[in-house]
Amino acid sequence: MSNLVGKLNEILADEWACVRALRRAESQCDDPGKGEVIKRIRKDCSVNCVSLANVIRALGGRPTDIPSPRFSLKLSDESLTDTLDMFQSTQQHIVDEIAALLDEPDLKSARSPLALVQQLHKENIRWLKSAMT
């Protein structure tokens, strides 16, 4: 079970990194329409953090509140495109990691919240791609 909580905490850290990257993207974006899309997706990621933290607590673990260093790196001359590319890479990583965990027997009661986090990321990937083209 502790291995499962550890894996979920890694996903939560990645989710926090998404929130951080989207905050940077909001400040880099000059287009009000695109800025609203970024803001909405950032709020979804914040909700995902709460959902993941609740799953971790339900499994008897303690949720992390530190963003993943792997996805939190900031380039010195980072453009909006760079930030959003890193964010989308993180989103896809989260989708894949949750997919790998959904069949775990110990996660039976947490499948719905995890599937919802996964689904929100899939929708946000499509939403962001359509808004940025």
Question: For each predicted feature, which ranges?
Answer:
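Short alpha-helical
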Residues: G33, V47, H93, S109, ...
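Residue-level recognition of alpha-helical structural elements
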Residues: L4, K34-V37, L80, D106-A110
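Alpha-helical bundle segments that constitute or directly flank the non-heme di-iron/ferroxidase center
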Residues: M1-C29, T81-P105, Q119, E123, ...
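Carboxylate-rich helix-loop segments that flank metal/cofactor sites and access channels
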Residues: V50-D96
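A short small-residue
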Residues: R24, D31, F71-L75
